[in-house]
Curated annotation (Swiss-Prot):
The biological activity of the toxin is produced by the A chain, which activates intracellular adenyl cyclase. InterPro entries: Enterotoxin_A (IPR001144). Belongs to the enterotoxin A family. The keyword Disulfide bond applies. Keywords: Disulfide bond, Enterotoxin, Signal, Toxin, Virulence. This is Heat-labile enterotoxin IIB, A chain. The active site is at 130. Residues 1-20 form the signal peptide. One of its GO terms (molecular function) is molecular adaptor activity. Disulfide bonds join 205-217. Pfam families: Enterotoxin_a (PF01375).
Length: 263
């Protein structure tokens, strides 16, 4: 009997792989749409072209959304959660009116911030277990997707042929310490006087701030977030270049001749 139980447990694990270090997002966009866009881009990136408004990459604003609970038109993050089950639950709540939607599986990387970890007791929706992707999720970070039809997940995961495991292998979400300074609480918000945020608070965010009115906490937070996003993109670009060179070498593009490499 024990062997039979062990067999079915093994079969279950093989049939439904666990993604302990990956993240999940329910989205109405089809894989073809995502591919054409180069990934899961934030709403603010689209709206920036139409409205001519800057993208807001303030984590607290993102987590709160609008008064109706919808995504802000200038939002610079893309939401994910920690389990397939949670993503399905959120998808049914937000996308239940669609006959079909998708749950994307996303590789861990430092562009993902733990909303509950960074915002602490000020996180507005802690039950969602959100990890917010700063600047969106590039196509190369998407491992694959599940199709949801009339509320039910159909079959297994479809793998994304453009996923770059070599770029994201071994990476993890950003540590909370990297997120405290871009938490984005409003000017003079109580959290800026509390641990841990007061240790990381930009001067413009402190309650006793006397900076000029054109240097607000929100504007400074956006600048810091833009800097972090630029650093992440540079890191991925450098790693991509390195992996490309290594693959060329491994494929025999370079031939060894008397201890010398030549084209």
């Amino acid at each position: 009997m024990a062997k039979v139980i062990s067999f079915f447990i093994s079969l279950f694990l093989i049939s439904f792989p666990l993604y302990a270090n990956d993240y999940f997002r329910a989205d109405s966009r089809t894989p073809d749409e995502v591919r054409r866009s180069g990934g899961l881009i934030p709403r603010g990136q689209d709206e920036a072209y139409e409205r001519g408004t800057p993208i807001n990459i303030n984590l607290y604003d993102h987590a709160r959304g609008t008064a109706t609970g919808n995504t802000r038109y200038n939002d610079g993050y893309v939401s994910t959660t920690t389990t397939l089950r949670q993503a399905h639950f959120l998808g049914q709540n937000m996308l239940g009116g669609y006959n079909e939607y998708y749950i994307y599986v996303v590789a861990a990387a430092p562009n993902l911030f733990d909303v509950n970890g960074v915002l602490g007791r000020y996180s507005p929706y802690p039950s969602e277990n959100e990890y917010a992707a700063l600047g969106g999720i590039p196509l190369s970070q998407i491992i694959g997707w599940y199709r949801v039809s009339f509320g039910a997940i159909e079959g297994g995961m479809h793998r994304n042929r453009d996923y770059r495991r070599d770029l994201f292998r071994g990476l993890s979400a950003a540590p909370n310490e990297d997120g405290y300074r871009i938490a984005g609480f409003p000017d003079g918000f109580p959290a800026w006087e509390e641990v841990p945020w007061r240790e990381f608070a930009p001067n413009s965010c402190l309650p006793n701030n006397k900076a000029s009115s054109d240097t607000t906490c929100a504007s400074l937070t956006n600048k810091l977030s833009q800097h972090d996003l630029a650093d992440f993109k540079k890191y991925i670009k450098r790693k991509f270049t390195l992996m490309t060179l290594l693959s060329i070498n491994n494929d025999g593009f370079f031939s060894n001749n008397g201890g010398k490499d030549e084209l």
